[in-house]
């Protein structure tokens, strides 16, 4: 029974493989690919720029820089106090 079912499946798969890719799946020509490279690079650059600007704005809007600056100041003051204590 298994052999009876597997043979038609094998024939269908073999037919699909031998048929080749569909026209929409065929590889594009190299010249058209090369022509699109500058557009793709510009699109990538614009996307990267927008994401970087958004990240910088997010950092500016948050209180992270102030907290970091305060933490460093406090830590530096503690180190200075330790120096004066043990000197």
Swiss-Prot record:
GO molecular function: fatty acid binding; phospholipase inhibitor activity
UniProt-annotated location(s): Secreted
Major location (coarse): secreted
GO biological process: lipid transport; lipoprotein metabolic process; negative regulation of cholesterol transport; negative regulation of lipid catabolic process; negative regulation of very-low-density lipoprotein particle clearance; triglyceride metabolic process; very-low-density lipoprotein particle clearance
One Pfam family named in its UniProt record: ApoC-I
Annotated signal sequence range: 1-26
Annotated GO CC locations: high-density lipoprotein particle; very-low-density lipoprotein particle
Secreted among keywords: yes
Keywords, ordered alphabetically: Lipid transport, Secreted, Signal, Transport, VLDL
Family matches, as PANTHER family: APOLIPOPROTEIN C-I
Family: Belongs to the apolipoprotein C1 family.
Cited function: Inhibitor of lipoprotein binding to the low density lipoprotein (LDL) receptor, LDL receptor-related protein, and very low density lipoprotein (VLDL) receptor. Associates with high density lipoproteins (HDL) and the triacylglycerol-rich lipoproteins in the plasma and makes up about 10% of the protein of the VLDL and 2% of that of HDL. Appears to interfere directly with fatty acid uptake and is also the major plasma inhibitor of cholesteryl ester transfer protein (CETP). Binds free fatty acids and reduces their intracellular esterification.
Descriptive protein name: Apolipoprotein C-I
